[in-house]
Amino acid sequence: MTVNDALKAASSQIAPACEISGANPVRVAKALLMRQLGVKIEWIFLNLNRELEDADGYFALAKRFANHEPLEYITGEAGFYGLSFNVKKGVLIPRPETEILVEKSLEILSNLPARKRPPLVAEIGAGSGIISICLALNSNAKIIASDISDDALNLARQNAAKFGVEDRIEFIKCAYLDQIYGQFDLLVSNPPYIARDYELDKFVLNEPHEALFGGAAGDEILKNIILVAKNRGVKYLACEMGYDQKASLESVLELSGFEAEFYRDLAGFDRGVVARNAFSNL
C-alpha cells in the first residue's frame, strides 16, 4: 500500500469521528502519519507513491481517533500561542481561546508600575503549564502555579524545561492558593467552568473531567477564586469563564470589591474577565 492509498483509507476510516470533532479528515490523516513515521509534512508530499512501512501501526492510530481519542493525545503535542507543547492523556488539552487570557494577562503585567522587583503572578489550575510558560516567556514575572493533579504538574514542569523557563516558575501541588504565599500582582486561572449536566462531545469527554466540570452550575470554582483573590489582596484577576456566567460572576466581583471588564472570544461569546481590586495596597 502506498502512502497516498493509506492516507485515503485512513481519511475514510476517521471521517465519522471528524464530523463530531469538526476536524478535516485529510488533515487528521496526515497528522497521524507524521506521528507514525516521525516526519514532517513535506516528506508526505514528496513520497505519496512510496510503499508505506508498518501500515498496520498507522491504521492503529487512525482507529484510536475513530474511537474519539483526541488527536493531541495521539500525537503527544498541541499548538498554543505559536508554540508546540507536550500533552498527554489525563491533562486538559490547550484551547485557542485561552490565548486571549494570556494576552489580557500580559497587558496587565506590562501596565504595572515600575518596581525594583519583578511582578509576582499566581496561577490556579496550571494544567500543562501553557499560561504560566507563555507569561514567563513574554514578561519578567516570577510565577507560582498550583494544580491538584500530579500528572498535570509533572507535564507542566516538562514543558517549562522545554522552553527554558523552569527557574522562573514554581509548580506546587495544592488547591487554590492553600500552600502558596506572597503578595500577588496578578492571579490568573483557566479553571473548570462547565456545568455538571452540560452535554459534551465524545472527544472532550476523553479529557479529565476534574479539569472540565466546575460544579452543578459550573461557576462554583470561579466564585471561590474571586474570594481567594479578595482575601489575599491580589491586585488584578484574570480568568476564563463559561459563555453564560457573566451575570453571576459580575455580582460576586462587585461585592468583592473588584472592578471588572469582561471579554469575548473570537466566536463572539463571553469568555473571560479581567478585574482590578480597588482595595489592594499593591
Region roles according to the model:
Residues I14, L109, A160, A229, ...:
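Conserved hydrophobic residues forming the short capping helix/wall of the S-adenosyl-L-methionine
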Residues A145, G214, A238:
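Conserved SAM-binding loop
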Residues M34-E107:
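Conserved AdoMet
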